[in-house]
Amino acid sequence: MKTTHLIASLAIIACTTAAWFLLGAALSYRTNESTATLQKEVSGVWGPALTQEHPHAWFETPNAPGGRAQVLPSSSQVTVLLASEPKRRGLLWHRTYEVDVKSDYVFTNPTKIPQTFYISYPLPADTAGLHGFAFLLGDDDNPAQSVPGPSGRVTRAILLPASGAVTLHTGYRTRGTNTWKYHFPDNHRIADFKLTMRTNFPEINFPVGTGSPGERAQNSDGFSLVWDYPDVLAAPSIGMDMPKRLNAGPVAARIAFF
């Protein structure tokens, strides 16, 4: 092969490589730009990644820091139904979902005298609306008082007799994107807690920093998962990532770079 032919071949290869690289870079840039823009639009309609915080109560006493003694539920039964409903905007799939949460929490007065308990249930932030919201404290189901305050919490007061207990029932349906989580307060003891999650998808993946279920059973369209914390200090959060869908832009960019 002549030197000129070799140089020409190398030049063609170099130009072709550069062209593919530029194409891949352009696809990556356009995809990232489009993803950021569309993600905001989708989150505005479907809501962000949602986190449900564990509820708590307190009563006033001079023997506690700040004059308040915090009390966590003595028993918790939580049921979560997660339905993946991916939505397509442009050429991109977004990991949207619907979630139905129902919970029963038992709060117990640990003292030998009657106490006024202030029971607080935090709501997920920036939701796309809570449908069928329920906050039933014992036998009093006055919906007029079950309205969140400025902090995004529903708080009710109830007088509990010595060693008495009351059950708080909560429930709602809403929508979110990417991830759903249930979070516990740091460095607190979680007792008699059980969360059962059912999904309509088999591709289960737990977010970084969350715990794995103690039980799992696959059914026709997804999984039934159980997290059981009978007595755990600093319990890990519980969570689920939505299944990923292949998007044309990132795939084309990887092919171009390859």
Question: What are the residue ranges of the model-derived segments?
Answer:
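Intrinsically disordered, low-complexity leader/linker segments that occur at the extreme N-terminus
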Residues: 16-20, 43, 50
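Juxtamembrane non-transmembrane segments of integral membrane proteins
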Residues: 44-64
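Cytosolic-side membrane-insertion boundary helix
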Residues: 228-258
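Hydrophobic membrane-insertion alpha-helices, especially the h-region
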Residues: 6-24
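Short coil/turn segments at secondary-structure boundaries
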Residues: 54-57, 209-210, 241-242
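Alpha-helical transmembrane signal-anchor/signal-peptide segments
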Residues: 26-49
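Soluble non-transmembrane domains of integral membrane proteins
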Residues: 44, 66-226, 232
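Positively charged n-region of N-terminal signal peptides that target proteins for export
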Residues: 1-5
